[in-house]
Amino acid sequence: MKPLFYVGAIAVTFMFWSSGIAKAAHFSGTLGEMAHFGLQPAWFFAAGTIALQLAGSALVVLGGRFAWLGAAALALFTLATIPLGHAFWTLPPEAAFGERLIAEEHLSVVGGLMLAALLAKLYGPKWPSRDATR
C-alpha cells in the first residue's frame, strides 16, 4: 500500500509543488502575478506562496504525523484563491463559465487533500507515539 500512497500523494500535490518550483525559478514573473492580484508587498506574498506550496506538498508526500498540516495549509490556500482569482459570480456569463469550472476543480482538489491527510494517517510512515518512548 505504501508505494500507491506515495504515487497518490505526489499526484494530488502536483499542482502545488510544480507551481512552487516554477514560481521560484521565475521569481520576477511571480512578483508580477502577486501585483496583478493586488497582493502587496509582492515579494512577501510571492515568497510565502512558494514556501507554502513546497512545504505543504512535502508534508503530504512524506506522510506521517504532519501530513494533515500540509493538506490543511494547501486546502486553505486553494480555497482562498477562489475569491481572489476566480470570482466567477462577479463576471458576465460568458466569462464566468470558465472561472466557475476552475473554482469547482479547486473544490475537488480540497477533497483530494482531505483524503490524502486521512490516508497518510492510516497508511503513511508510522511515527513513535509519546507512549512508546516512555
Residue map of PLM features:
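Short juxtamembrane and helix-loop transition motifs at transmembrane-helix boundaries
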Residues: 9, 27-40
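Extended, low-polarity transmembrane helix blocks
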Residues: 1-25, 43-55, 62-134
